[in-house]
Amino acid sequence: MVAVVDMGSNSFILLLQHEGETLLEEVYEVGLKSIEDEDEAFEVASQVISQIKTKVQNVPIHVFGTAIFRERPHLFERIVRQFRLKGEILSEEDEAYFTYMSVDPSFEKSITVFDLGGGSLEVVRKDWFMSLPLGTHVLNRLFDLSLPEIRQFEEAVKHVESMLPSFTNPVGVGGSFVAIASMKRGKWDLKAVEGFVLNWSDVEAVIERLRGNSFEQVRGWNVIPAGREKTIVAGCAVALAITKHEPVKVSTKGFRHTVARMLEEGGIQRPWARSG
């Protein structure tokens, strides 16, 4: 049995796995990208890690930092040291390909994986990847996407479109895609949204439902995790830019599933680096 924590800019995600079977998967919203003070960010992260350690006892916990911790490695080191955790900060390449492998573990498919976090958007094919500064917190800083008005949504969509590479068969990974699909379905159910296909009209419908409602009202719908209401509009901007070209298939997986499988099998491997 192994416990893996994906420590992201928007959220920390706990995955408890045994022999390839998911026993527990929980999302904890943290919003670290919007917290500039390191002590405050450490306190928020520590509260979540404390909850996780209480919930997962007598199981080794492996933590993996992504974009926010590539920017702030000292914060990651403080957390790991404080809680005596095993962990590492993933490079952009590692994060991209581990995420890709959660969808296509054998590198056989002709797909483009879009992994949207708070700090970046990873675009990954089986033989190529790029990291774009299009995370939800980044877009929130660049544009006024605040509820209820959502004043600069169209501008945000155009900005994303201008930076996207060409792609085919898109797969959307990350809490924002899951949240949009959940809003469309009316409830948060990871099994139900796995493989859900979002088209542009679905994303438009979610935006229209959000428009005119406050953060508190959206949170009160109890459809998406508390805190996600602050980033879902930015997520819709990315999703709409993608679905204008092709519908996107939603995946609830992520790099945590790949590294958990590898840890159970004996250790982390990087097959894309063998020729390097």
Positions of predicted regions on the chain:
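Short glycine-aspartate micro-motif
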Residues: 2-6, 111-115, 170
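Ser/Thr-glycine-rich phosphate-binding loops at phosphate-binding pockets of nucleotides
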Residues: 9-11, 103, 117-123, 175
